[in-house]
Amino acid sequence: GDVYKRQIHKRNGKTILEHVHGAACGAWWTANLCADGTPNGYGVYEISGNTIANQYYKSTNKEADYQIRAYSATQVFGKSGSLTFGWAANAPAMNDAKCIVANVWNSDASGNWKVSLWQNGTKVCDMTRVKTYDYWAYAYHVLYYSKSVGTTWGKNLDHYYYGNLASGTPGAADFEIVAEDGMGNTYRTSKLQTDFTGF
C-alpha cells in the first residue's frame, strides 16, 4: 500500500509491463492514500480472449474517471511555522507561478500516455513527465501520521507531470488537464487540490 508503480521490463525480447498496485488500505494499512499520493484503490482489468482489453485504477469511494490530482507548483503544504513541502523549492523547473503539477497515478513509461494542459479551451502544452514526490501527500503523512522526514517511506516516482499555463496562476486560471492512456480512455480534471479536505 505504500506506492503504485508501473514498470516496463524487457525479458527474452518481450516487453513486460509490471504493475505494483496501490492498496485499498493505503500506506501503513491505515492511511487514506498511498505514500506516493495514489488514492486507496485497486486495479481493474477487462479481459477479451487472451488480451487485456482495458485496464484502469479504481480509487475507493470515487468514480472510475478519478485518475488525476492537480496542484499549483508554488503552493507550500504543511503547517505554518512547522515543516512545509512543495515543488518550487525542490525543483527549479517548477519554480514558476504559472506551473501546474499533475499526479496521474496509473500512467507509465510506455509512451502510450499523453498528458496535456489546456487553458480557456485551448491546448497550452504537452505536460512533461518528471520523477518527483507528491509533496501534498508527503505533507499529509508527516502531519497526520507523524512520519519522519528523510526516512525511506517517501516515494520519488515518475507518474507526475508538469506544465506552465499561458498566463495567470493555477488558482485563478480556467485550466484543464487531459490524460489519454493509449487504451481509449481519456481522463480530465480542472480541480486544484489545495488542502486535505476529503482525506
Q: What role is predicted for each listed range?
A:
Residues 134-164:
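Aromatic sugar-binding surface patches on proteins
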Residues 192-198:
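Short beta-strand edge segments in extracellular beta-sheet folds
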Residues 16-107, 111-119, 160-190:
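Binuclear metal-dependent phosphoesterase catalytic core
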Residues 11-12:
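Glycan-recognition and catalytic cores of secretory/periplasmic carbohydrate-active enzymes
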Residues 3-4:
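Short, small-residue-biased leader/transition segments that mark boundaries at the very start
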Residues 112-137:
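Extended low-complexity, serine/threonine- and proline-enriched intrinsically disordered segments
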